Design a protein with these regions (language model features):
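Feature captures the catalytic cores and cofactor-binding loops of soluble hydro-lyases/lyases
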Residues: 1-131
C-alpha cells in the first residue's frame, strides 16, 4: 500500500482529501477502496442494503448531511459489513454501538456517536456525487 502522502505527491491534481473532521470508530484506522456513495438523511435502510452486498475493495461513503439526530451505523451493520468484506465506511453523520464496532476488522469514520437509531423509510439515493 502506497502511503497517502506519496499518493498526494504523485497525483496532486487528481485526488480529493476528506476534511479531518472524522473520528475513527472501527477496528482499522487505515483503509482504501473504490468509493460507493449514498446520500441519506436520518434513514439507514440503504446503508444496510449496501453493506449486505459484496464490498471487496470498496468503501461506503455516506453523506448523512452531518445530521446529529441519530446514528446511521451500529454494531449489527458493522458486523454485516465486515462479513461482506467492505474495506471501510465513512459517514458524514453518526454511529452507535461503539464497543461493537471497534472489534470489527473494518474501518469506520464518522462525525460522532449518538445512541438513537435511525428511521427506516427506504430513503436516500445511491451513486451520487458528494462534495
Amino acid at each position: 500500500m502506497l502511503p497517502t502522502a506519496d499518493i498526494c505527491d504523485k497525483y496532486p491534481e487528481s485526488i480529493l482529501i476528506a476534511k479531518p473532521i472524522f473520528k475513527d470508530f472501527g477496528g482499522r484506522t487505515a483503509f482504501f477502496g473504490k468509493a460507493v456513495t449514498l446520500k441519506t438523511l436520518d434513514d439507514n435502510t440503504k446503508v444496510r442494503s449496501s453493506l449486505e452486498t459484496d464490498g471487496t475493495n470498496k468503501v461506503l461513503v455516506v453523506d448523512g448531511e452531518g445530521s446529529m439526530n441519530c446514528a446511521l451505523l451500529g454494531g449489527n451493520l458493522a458486523s454485516i459489513a465486515s462479513e461482506n468484506n467492505w474495506s471501510g465506511i465513512i459517514i458524514n453523520g453518526c454511529v452507535r454501538d461503539q464497543l461493537e464496532i471497534i472489534v470489527e476488522k473494518i474501518g469506520v469514520k464518522a462525525l460522532a456517536a449518538h445512541p438513537k437509531k435511525s428511521i427506516k423509510n427506504d430513503g436516500g439515493e445511491f451513486n451520487v456525487t458528494l462534495n
